[in-house]
Structure formats: C-alpha cells, structure tokens
Curated annotation (Swiss-Prot):
GO MF entries: transmembrane transporter activity
The organism's taxonomic lineage, starting at the top: Bacteria, Pseudomonadati, Pseudomonadota, Gammaproteobacteria, Enterobacterales
Name this polypeptide is given: Protein TsgA
Organism encoding this protein: Salmonella schwarzengrund (strain CVM19633)
Domain of life: Bacteria
Gene that produces this protein: tsgA
Gene3D superfamilies hit by this protein: MFS general substrate transporter like domains
Length: 393
C-alpha cells in the first residue's frame, strides 16, 4: 500500500468520527428549535432523535457482516447519496414522520461510515500505534463536538433555520466522498485473498463483559449529560450562547485530553489508569451538577480532559483480552457503546419530563460511577497484561 493511499484512508477514518460526533452532539443545541418548528414539547421531541441513534446502532451491528459482502468504497459512495437525500428531506419536509425517517437514514450513514473508519485504523496500524491512532481518530469526534455547536449557535442566533446545521454537517461527508476517488481500500470476505492460515478461536473471558457494560454506561452517561447541559444551563438563566459555550468547552478539552493521553497512556498500565480516570470523571461531573454557575465552565473543562481517554481505552483493553485482536470483539464493544447512544433519549427523555434536566445529569453521574466499578472489577480478571507485551515491540 502506498503512503498517499494510507494517508487518504486515515483521513477517511478521522472524518468518519467527525461526522458521527457532529450528528450526535449537535442534537442538544438544535432540539429546542426543532421542537418549536414542530410545535412539540422538548421532552417528547427528544424521543424522535432515538431514530438517529437506532440507525447508528443497526448499521454498526450489521456492518460486521456487510463489510465482507459490499466493498467499502461502494458503501461510502452510496452513503453520500443517502446523506444528500436525508438532508433534503429535513429541508423540504414539514412532516414529523419524514423528519424521523431522515434522522434514521443519517444514523445509518454515520454508523456505517464510523464502523468503516474504526476498521481501517485497526487494519492500517498495529500494536501501540493502533491504540494512539484510535485515540487520535476519536479526537475528531470531539473536534466536531467543539466546532458544530458553535456553528449551530452562530446560525440559530441569526434566525437561520435549524436544518442548515445539518447541511453544514453534510460537508464532512462530501469530504469523505471526494477522498474515495483514487483510493484503494482493503479487500474483505469474498473479495479478499485467502493466503493466510485460519486463526484459532479464543474465548473472550468475563473481562469483555465488564468492558461492554462500561462502554454502554459511559456513552449513555456522557451523551445523557452533554445533551441536557444546554437545557439545564438555560434553566439557570444562562443565554443560548453561554449554554452552547459549555458544550463546546467540554469537547474542546476532551479533544486536547485525547491528544495528551495518546502520549501519557503508554507510560501506565491501561486498566489502572482507566480506573483512576473513571473515578476522577465521576467526581468532576458531580461537582459540575452541584457547583455554582461561576464554577461550571471550570468543572466541565476538567471533566472533558479527564474523561477523554476512557472510551478508547475501553476499546483498546477489549482488543487486548485475546492474543490476536478480534474485529468481532471490538465490534461487540463498539455496539454496546452504540446501544448507550441509542438509549440516550429513551432513558433521559422521561426523566427530564418528570423531574427536569438536573435529574438527567444526576442519572448520568450514576452511570459514570458504574463505569468506575466495572473498570475496578476488571483489574481482577483482565488478560491485557499477558497479551499486550508483544504489541509493545
């Protein structure tokens, strides 16, 4: 594989995470405007975003098999057509059913793209380089989470309709579409050359279950928290711009945290530092929820930084539970994380409707505590210490 081809594939991976990040994170910013557009209460409007998350979940789950049947380049190009149709549906329809369908299609497209992005990184890089590349790739999720809420606040403050936010997100996929030209993708399944000897199957072990629960609770907690921060902040008397700034601050420090931890993690045992980070994140989230308005930006900045490496470390630890990194195992943990994404508004919507945004934030805090417990318990059963040493060379 040529170096320019590897660079193109790596950038497709980066942008695939940015696309999913933009779609998922911008929800909290535009939810109120979309609720007004359809004349619905915010809590019931949030349920329709479950279609976006369901699309992401279904596509990541199915793509473990689809990648072996349909070439990756074909999937990405077909995804671009679906993206254009979905954004057009949002712009020209006033029907809630069509809005839900468009959200589902956007979820399908971003889930397929993200699973391809994750697969490409695990194929292109090995050993410790894989972990740091995955962390750097995941930082594009946060970068989109920092940029697009600011774009949304800029457009909404100027009374520009909410659907233009999704048109802007579509530009990320346009870049992916352009990169597919003149680019060779790894072949899989029936398209691949079967020269290698089959790899013996390994049992996953109970550590994978702990990591799967941690992945689900972490993503559900993180998105449950960040989706309702704008509404919570507005309830405290903050302006839309200040509320948006809290979300952007979180993702900005999350992004810087990922860059920092891609260097820091190599000096520590991954399970131990993951447990410490999960504990610190749970405490910082509690301080944000119970703290004064003046301290909120500082708590959310430090929360973003210290929680940045948690999810990627969970995935990396998962890949180290077997001697040979299993794509299905990694996909299983990714799927559990995506179930957390799908459940975000299913779980938090009724809580907000019944008890308000602060109750949703406290629920998220409880989920972070579960992540800490799972990571701590993993220390007694993890196999990463016996499997990760060869990867270091």
């Amino acid at each position: 594989m040529t170096n320019s081809n590897r660079i193109k594939l790596t950038w497709i991976s980066f942008l695939s995470y940015a696309l999913t990040g933009a779609l998922v994170i911008v929800t909290g910013m535009v939810m109120g405007n979309i609720a007004d557009y359809f004349q619905l209460p915010v809590s019931s409007m949030s349920n329709t975003f479950t279609f976006l998350n369901a699309g992401i979940l279904i596509s990541i789950f199915l793509n473990a098999w689809l990648m072996e049947i349909i070439p990756l380049k074909t999937q990405l190009r077909f995804g671009f057509i679906l993206m254009v149709l979905a954004v057009a549906g949002l712009m020209f329809s006033h029907s809630l059913a069509l809005f839900s369908a468009a959200m589902f299609v956007l979820g399908l497209v971003s889930g397929i793209t993200m699973s391809i992005g994750t697969f490409l990184i695990t194929q292109l890089y090995e050993g410790r380089q894989r972990g740091s590349r995955l962390l750097f790739t995941d930082s594009f999720f946060s970068m989109a989470g920092m940029i697009f809420p600011m774009v949304a606040a800029f457009l909404l403050a100027r009374s520009i309709e909410w659907y233009w936010v999704y048109a802007c997100i579509g530009l990320v996929y346009l870049a992916i579409f352009i990169l597919t030209f003149g680019c060779e993708f790894p072949a899989l399944g029936k398209h691949a050359q079967h020269s290698q000897a089959p790899v013996a199957k390994e049992k996953w072990g109970i550590g994978v279950l702990f990591l799967a629960v941690a992945a689900l609770c972490y993503i559900l907690g993180q998105l449950g928290f960040i989706s309702w921060v704008p509404e919570y902040a507005k309830g405290l008397g903050m302006s839309l711009n200040d509320a948006g700034a809290l979300v952007s601050d979180f993702w900005m420090s999350y992004m810087f945290g990922m860059w920092a931890f891609s260097f820091i993690l190599r000096f520590f045992d991954l399970q131990r530092i993951l447990t410490v980070l999960a504990g610190i994140a749970a405490v910082l989230m509690y301080l944000f929820i119970t703290g004064t308005q003046a301290h909120m930006p500082w708590f959310i900045l430090t929360l973003g930084f210290f929680s940045s490496a948690i999810y990627t470390s969970i995935i990396t630890l998962g890949s180290q539970q077997t001697k040979v990194a299993s794509p299905k195992l990694v996909n299983f943990i990714l799927t559990c994380g995506t179930i957390g994404t799908m459940l975000t508004f299913v779980v938090t919507g009724p809580i907000v409707a019944h008890s308000g945004p602060q109750a949703a934030l406290l629920t998220a805090n409880g989920l972070y505590a579960v992540v800490f417990v799972m990571c701590f318990a993993l220390g007694f059963v993890s196999r990463h210490r016996q499997h990760s040493s060869p990867a270091a060379h």
